[in-house]
């Protein structure tokens, strides 16, 4: 696995690089957004770890720009901002997960591995509920044969809902899919991801297909 680390603090960047390499992965380390763009385009990383306080372009701006350009790799954010509003902003920008500073390197590694487990390929298989189609091997959602660009976590939610078409999926069940490690779970994350997912679906298919069932969870159903 190739990891892109975007962090302007040289010492922290070095520690992250060493730890990730020791885990058996390849690492490209960038000190600013310009260098990050270069590695993104030239080395095609599998996941990016992005600090928000970059010198040339704010990390949130970088993430939004990548997502608007259909960059779909998982993104883990490093941030010193601790309020729930800041966390919601990070997720709304297109990040898949975040770690607040100060942090233990072990937590960064655990969250990175959790993201990659969610993004790993499966045996070739397609779930078709016209006009919706999920390609399990490519981890892609298509509506009317148009691929919808989803983040790793958005895709996992969509796959889980479609696998349970017509059945209510609890928030706890979705959290388990996203975060197998219990200590990494934060329930409000689902609400943010679900809001993003609904917007992307409605841009291509205006009818409501994901319903919130009060006190129970979420329901995917074609009417």
Swiss-Prot record:
Gene3D superfamilies, A to Z: 3.40.50.2300, 6.10.250.690, Winged helix-like DNA-binding domain superfamily/Winged helix DNA-binding domain (1.10.10.10)
Limits of the Response regulatory domain: 2-116
Principal location class: cytoplasm
Name this polypeptide is given: Virulence transcriptional regulatory protein PhoP
One of the GO BP terms on file: regulation of DNA-templated transcription
UniProt PTM: Phosphorylated by PhoQ.
Protein's job: Member of the two-component regulatory system PhoQ/PhoP involved in virulence and adaptation to low Mg(2+) environments. Necessary for resistance to killing by polymorphonuclear leukocytes (PMNs) and cationic antimicrobial peptides (CAMP) they produce.
Signal peptide positions (record): none
CC per GO annotation: cytosol; protein-DNA complex
DNA-binding region, residue range(s): 124-222
PANTHER family with a match to the protein in the record: REGULATOR OF RPOS, TRANSCRIPTIONAL REGULATORY PROTEIN PHOP
Compartment(s): Cytoplasm
